[in-house]
Curated annotation (Swiss-Prot):
<dbReference type="InterPro" id="IPR008928">
    <property type="entry name" value="6-hairpin_glycosidase_sf"/>
</dbReference>
<dbReference type="GO" id="GO:0005829">
    <property type="term" value="C:cytosol"/>
</dbReference>
<dbReference type="GO" id="GO:0005993">
    <property type="term" value="P:trehalose catabolic process"/>
</dbReference>
<feature type="glycosylation site" description="N-linked (GlcNAc...) asparagine">
    <location>
        <position position="451"/>
    </location>
</feature>
<keyword id="KW-0732">Signal</keyword>
<dbReference type="GO" id="GO:0005615">
    <property type="term" value="C:extracellular space"/>
</dbReference>
<feature type="glycosylation site" description="N-linked (GlcNAc...) asparagine">
    <location>
        <position position="288"/>
    </location>
</feature>
<feature type="binding site">
    <location>
        <position position="237"/>
    </location>
    <ligand>
        <name>substrate</name>
    </ligand>
</feature>
<dbReference type="InterPro" id="IPR001661">
    <property type="entry name" value="Glyco_hydro_37"/>
</dbReference>
<feature type="active site" description="Proton donor/acceptor">
    <location>
        <position position="343"/>
    </location>
</feature>
<feature type="glycosylation site" description="N-linked (GlcNAc...) asparagine">
    <location>
        <position position="359"/>
    </location>
</feature>
<comment type="function">
    <text>Enzyme that cleaves trehalose to produce 2 glucose molecules that can be used by the glycolytic pathway. Glycolysis is essential in glial cells but not in neurons; neurons rely on the citric acid cycle for their energy needs, and on lactate and alanine secreted into the hemolymph by glial cells to fuel it.</text>
</comment>
<comment type="similarity">
    <text>Belongs to the glycosyl hydrolase 37 family.</text>
</comment>
<feature type="binding site">
    <location>
        <begin position="200"/>
        <end position="201"/>
    </location>
    <ligand>
        <name>substrate</name>
    </ligand>
</feature>
<dbReference type="Pfam" id="PF01204">
    <property type="entry name" value="Trehalase"/>
</dbReference>
<feature type="binding site">
    <location>
        <position position="193"/>
    </location>
    <ligand>
        <name>substrate</name>
    </ligand>
</feature>
<feature type="binding site">
    <location>
        <position position="556"/>
    </location>
    <ligand>
        <name>substrate</name>
    </ligand>
</feature>
Length: 596
């Protein structure tokens, strides 16, 4: 067991970065405990794991570079992913001298020259890595009957080699020169502009790796997350220090469950229990709210200022607010929306009249109790209890079963809506359910956060909900919402993880109607992905529900290719349904078809 003597200094680092209003603050847990699976880290990083945050997370240098006119970078993320050529202190000292010499009004060219001298291009901290356990012909290919789909499976399996990344040794030796968070093992990254690991993306990436028999790579990625929890007390949104104030949907325990199911390595889960418990407690202690006498959780962030990776965009939307306090609250809502993974969506809009109308100025993420987060936490508690049962820890089994039961009761009494026939997010401002479709309304089905004895009743109400909202009418998959706002997590965009939650959730109901719809939607998703790949040779981050075989759009950046979670979901469904799906079989979708 590795002692973390300097972890309390992390709290000091955090306290220097947190400057939210009283309405938005919450305390951090005690991070002074010993943990299994902790790894030694570079001494300098241990002293101040966020040493580079003075460059990449906040301050006048960040603000000046990111708001330069004309702008220096098309994408705000470019700058905060660059490597420092000097120490943070030296860089700040010389920046301040330059600002003084330019009377605090440097030109865009002055700033460009400064960046060119003091920073190196993004990605220099990483090198391409071919996973050592990659197999040319993994066994899932034998489960695919259609020859075209089988060849596609071969090509998808090869993409893992394209997405492999390994951090250079200098990152762990000099972490203060980088925004990237050092981890001990290589990773599979999402792709495109996302050249580092991301938390919830990794769940579906790891599932795909396991089906590809890449057990060592999958285990290494999970162990990276263990090391991060054991150093920082939680898993940031992604592998950069500028994500320090927020996490993403808590799926680490689910990753461990997936690994154990494939390998039967119960010891791996048992040894990880302290870490998994700590992450669970981080969420329930720091994201909790009380609604109708139930303790449930919301998405929220603990940092101040705009998102560094979208700095210019946040400053621009913040200009709509009249005071610094109002701007800060808006930045908090933006980052809470990012923690949800759905950045951004009308799901998080609360208009003055209590609807989901508006734009980003209406973001109220921290005032919405989300179905998915609470369902995931229920699942975490159940899995932790299961792992303790394997270890023979009967007291801990009872403790976490009790936690799960309390969460389930809250989900049932606050979030289940009898009239809608599904679960609905809850608006704490207007004290009412939010009756707007989003796939997460069905997320309890995926993690079995419902009474199995009521499966028939729930199935009937869910199928009626699908019919009422015409969710089966989209040729390119089921969209994330039915609102066309231009945000990337609204219509017409459709995302692999949300299709997965819908399909696997319906299958878990185990009724003929639900299972048939599950297979129909899985087939449709495989085919629209195949059509897009056949045409463009890309797996996309998101797709267009209104058009068969077309990538998505909208949001703050161009649609990205790669793409980790899209690959993972397709590989899993080719493994599960490859004998049932053929290019010529029906799915309610046709090449070139558009929704009317």
């Amino acid at each position: 067991m590795f002692k973390l003597p300097t972890i309390s200094l992390l709290l000091v680092s955090w306290s220097c970065l947190v400057a939210l209003s009283q309405a938005k603050t919450y305390s951090l847990p005690d991070l002074t405990t010993d943990y299994n699976n902790a790894i030694p880290v570079d001494e300098e990083e241990a002293q101040d794991p966020f040493a580079s945050c003075k460059i990449y997370c906040e301050g006048n240098l960040l603000h000046t570079i990111q708001t330069a006119v004309p702008k220096l970078f098309a994408d705000s993320k470019t700058f905060v992913d660059m490597k420092l050529n000097n120490s943070p202190d030296k860089t700040l000292e010389d920046f301040n001298a330059m600002m003084e010499a330019k009377n605090q009004t440097p030109s865009s060219e002055d700033l460009k020259q400064f960046v060119d001298k003091y920073f190196s291009a993004p990605g220099t901290e990483l090198e391409k890595w071919t996973p050592t356990d990659w197999k040319e012909n993994p066994s899932f290919l034998d489960l695919i009957s259609d020859p075209d789909l089988k060849q596609w499976g071969v090509e998808l399996n090869s993409i893992w080699k394209d997405l492999g990344r390994k951090m250079k040794d200098e990152v762990s030796k000099n972490p203060e020169y980088y925004s990237i968070i050092p981890v001990p093992n290589p990773v599979i990254v999402p792709g495109g502009r996302f050249i580092e690991f991301y938390y919830w993306d990794s769940y579906w990436i790891i599932r795909g790796l396991l089906y590809s028999q890449m057990f060592d790579t999958a285990r290494g990625m999970i162990e990276n997350f263990f090391s991060i929890v054991n150093r920082f007390g939680f898993i940031p949104n992604g592998g950069r220090v500028y994500y320090h104030g927020r996490s993403q949907p808590p799926l680490l325990t689910g990753m461990v469950k997936s690994y154990v199911d494939f390998t039967n390595d119960d010891k791996f889960a048992i040894d990880a229990l302290d870490t998994l418990e700590h992450e669970f407690e981080f969420f329930v202690n720091n994201h909790n709210v009380t609604v109708k006498n139930h303790s449930l959780c919301v998405y929220r962030d603990s940092s101040s200022g705009p998102r560094p990776e979208s700095y210019r965009e946040d400053v621009e939307t913040g200009e709509e607010f009249p005071t610094d306090e109002a701007k800060e609250l808006h930045y908090s809502e933006l980052k809470a929306g990012a923690e949800s993974g759905m950045d951004f969506s009308s799901r998080w809009f609360i208009s003055p009249t209590g609807t989901n109308d508006g734009n980003r100025s209406a973001l109220s993420t921290t005032s919405i109790v989300p179905v998915d987060l609470n369902a995931y936490l229920y699942w975490n508690a159940k899995l932790i209890a299961e792992f303790h049962s394997k270890a023979g820890n009967t007291k801990k089994v009872t403790e976490y079963e009790t936690k799960a039961e309390k969460l389930l009761l809250g989900i049932q009494e606050v979030l289940w809506n009898e009239e809608a026939g599904v679960w609905l997010d809850y608006d704490m401002i207007n004290q009412k359910p939010r009756d707007y479709y989003t796939p997460t309304n069905l997320s309890p089905l995926w993690v079995k956060a419902f009474n199995i004895s009521e499966s028939e009743k729930i199935s009937a109400s869910v199928m009626a909900y699908i019919e009422r909202n015409k969710l089966d009418s989209f040729p390119g998959g089921v969209p994330n919402t039915l609102s066309y706002t231009g945000e990337q997590w609204d219509a017409p965009n459709v995302w692999a993880p949300m299709q997965y939650i819908l399909v696997e959730g319906l299958n878990n109901l185990n009724t003929p109607e639900a299972k048939n719809m599950s297979l129909k939607w899985a087939t449709r998703w495989v085919k629209t992905n195949f059509a897009a790949f056949s045409k463009d040779r890309h797996m996309y981050e998101k797709y267009n529900a209104d058009e068969f075989g077309v990538g998505g759009g909208g949001g703050e950046y161009e649609v990205q290719t790669g793409f980790g979670w899209s690959n993972g979901v397709i590989i899993e469904w080719l493994s599960k349904h490859g004998r049932d799906i053929s290019i010529g079989s029906g799915c309610g979708c046709l090449a070139g078809e558009k929704r009317q």
